């Protein structure tokens, strides 16, 4: 990998929406992890290889097979953990959107949903790789406690717990809400974004949210979109 390039790993990658956005912003993907075969097939067809419409993953390592992977199974293999450690200093960003059903106000919203633990698998990858930046995207419900007045005292939201876990790993952390409709998407889609910046990097996680605010007008004008809607 050439020095100075922005490189990323996409976890819970789905069919590649985040991967495509990173590619269009000039990032170089290392690899993506997705367990669903149909979603991974879509990602691979569109984003992996020189014959794909978008060659978003030019540096896919040999030790990661180009196939669906369950994150728990992936991290259970010593060769994968060794491979991740070998990427230290080569990865700018570890990003992902873990399954959101347990956090979603539009769904069951269940604090005991077994999928809720998957955000900690992303943190495990962060610990192994030590990227400069970590990013978690999820529904707004991840920023809210599951119980407003639990019997055993106040409980932080999962987003707050992730920020604390990032701090324990040596990262500055913050979370906020981004609404895609403010950037021209014809849909009110509020998403929670959790950002971690490694302590030795001269930047603050809050800079991400300030930058989003600062570039909004320029972005809308560039694409010929109205600035006063929605």
Positions of predicted regions on the chain:
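Conserved beta-strand elements of the Class I
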Residues: 7-9
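Conserved short alpha-helix immediately C-terminal to the canonical SAM/SAH-binding motif I
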Residues: 38-42, 118
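Glycine-rich SAM-binding Motif I of class I
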Residues: 16-20
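Class I S-adenosyl-L-methionine
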Residues: 77-91, 103-230
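A short, Lys/Arg-enriched amphipathic alpha-helix followed by its capping loop at the start of a domain
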Residues: 21-28, 46
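S-adenosyl-L-methionine
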Residues: 41-86
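Conserved acidic E/D residue at the C-terminus of a beta-strand in Rossmann-like folds
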Residues: 31-37, 137-141
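Class I SAM-dependent methyltransferase "Motif I" SAM/SAH-binding loop
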Residues: 11-15
């Amino acid at each position: 990998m050439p020095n100075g390039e922005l490189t990323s790993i996409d976890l819970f990658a789905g069919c590649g929406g985040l991967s495509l956005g990173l590619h269009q912003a000039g990032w170089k993907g290392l690899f993506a992890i997705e367990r669903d075969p149909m979603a991974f097939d879509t990602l691979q067809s569109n984003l992996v290889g020189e014959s794909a419409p978008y060659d978003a993953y030019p540096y896919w390592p040999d030790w990661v097979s180009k196939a669906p992977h369950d994150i728990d199974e992936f991290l259970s293999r010593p060769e994968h953990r060794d491979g991740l450690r070998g990427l230290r200093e080569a990865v700018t960003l570890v990003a992902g959107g873990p399954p959101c059903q347990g956090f979603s106000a539009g769904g069951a919203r269940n604090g005991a949903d077994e999928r809720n633990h998957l955000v900690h698998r992303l943190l495990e990858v962060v610990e192994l790789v030590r990227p400069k930046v970590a990013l978690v995207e999820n529904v707004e419900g991840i920023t809210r406690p599951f119980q407003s007045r639990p019997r055993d005292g106040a409980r932080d939201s999962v987003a707050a717990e992730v920020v604390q876990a990032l701090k324990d790993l040596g990262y500055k952390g913050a979370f906020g809400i981004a609404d895609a409709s403010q950037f021209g998407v014809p849909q009110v889609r509020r998403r929670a974004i959790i950002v971690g910046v490694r302590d030795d990097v001269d930047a603050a996680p809050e800079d991400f949210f300030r930058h989003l605010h600062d570039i909004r007008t320029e972005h809308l004008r560039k694409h010929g979109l109205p600035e006063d809607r929605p």
